[in-house]
Each structure stands twice: as structure tokens, then as C-alpha cells.
């Protein structure tokens, strides 16, 4: 996974750190491209976002919207692998993944 330190990976919750490894594997296995961490705890997010609590990341890959069916398959696989304490949401430009224990 391509990670720019300016994207806010310092102090990520340990559960989110593990997400990066799993997402990297799932995306590379499906698409054979290296995913990008677009945001960790940096950037502007909605009020109350789990990004600010170090419990969310945004991930994309090039080209993001070329094959929408891949986005759905990858999101579904991540939901399966990560379990019910994680939310995986396909946004317009990225996957949003957060640790939100139920």
C-alpha cells in the first residue's frame, strides 16, 4: 500500500493498522494494483468522524471508477474479513473503513 506520512497515520488505533494490511491484500489480489491510503487522521471530515479518533481510513486505487463492480466486490470481501465491528462504505472517490464496535 502506498502511504504518504502526511496523510495522518500517526497514532492510528491498532485495529485500523491491521485494516491496512488486509485491504492491501484484498485489493492487490482482485486488481493487481497497489492501493493508496488517501486519509487516516488528517484532512477535513464530517463532524464526529472516526477519522479524528484514529479509527478510520480512506483507501483508493487507480483507476478508481473504471470498473464499479470491483469496488462492490472489494467492499463486500473487506466486510467479510473485517467483521461486524467495522464499517466499509464505498464513497464516490474511495473506500471509507472505520472501526465502530457494535
Model regions and ranges:
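Catalytic cores and adjacent binding grooves of peptidoglycan-active enzymes
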Residues: 6-12, 36, 41-57, 61-102
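Active-site acidic/histidine clusters and adjacent loop/turn architecture
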Residues: 1-31
